Structures are given as C-alpha cells and as structure tokens.
C-alpha cells in the first residue's frame, strides 16, 4: 500500500518551479534572463515593513494569531476598502489568508465534491487545475483570445457552463 494518496498521484510536477530553476541555472552561467516563474519580488522588503516586523517581535508579538486574521488587521482592511473602494464590511466578513492560492485551495476543499466542474479561463496560473483536481473537482479550461484581452466572453462562459459547474475563476 502506498503512503501517497490517489489524489496526490494525479498532480504533475510544478511548471513554475521548473522554469524558476532553469532561470537560476542560466543566470549561474552568466546568461541574462528575465524570470517568468515564481512571483518573487525583484526588490528588497521596504524598511518601514522591516521595522514594523522588528518592533512587533521586540514587543512580544510572536505567538499564533487567529487563523482568519487579528482584529487590528481586519480593522485596517475594513478601513482600506471603505477609503479606497467605498465598500463597507464588518470584521465577520473579512478572512485573511497567506495568499490568493491558499485561499482558493481552501475554498475548493470546502465546497467541491467529486466531479464538480470549475471553469478556468486560459491563460491562468498553472496551479489552478491541480488545486481543483486535489479537491476532487474537474477543471474545465476555456481558452481566451488576445483580441478579447485574454478575458472570457459572455458567450464562451455560457457555453462552458454545465449542470456540473460549481465554480468559475475570474
């Protein structure tokens, strides 16, 4: 009996990691490469962020926090949405995650049943289909054209929707 689940066996090696590693190898031999792999910033963390982190650590703010975000962070997010987007939210409507992919994966795991379809317009982030597969769903890729700014058209979306469609990434 294998220790690896059947779900994990369906996942392919990460193209993002492969292209990132290839770029590193080429740079190491002196090639001028523009990396289009992992989304690492090409700049150092700004000093105000470093200083805030140091201050928090020195102030003893080193323990686990609420999984969905601290009250202070939620308050800052609410303020941002009100000021910049004129949107009103309560703290119960705000959930913080470690990144967009993690939040999407959690949503898929919480809501998809085996065979549920998720419409994914292409081009897309390479992880999306595997995230859907791990959650038991079926990715349904819809190719988008440059002439449409690589956005799914209402007609293409309508054609992609079936009785098994449960989610649409946009």
Predicted segments with their positions:
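N-terminal small-domain helix-loop-helix segment of the aminotransferase-like
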Residues: 2-99, 106
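Structural signature of beta-strand start/N-cap positions in the alpha/beta core
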Residues: 32, 116-117, 138, 166-167
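CheY-like receiver
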Residues: 22, 107, 156-160
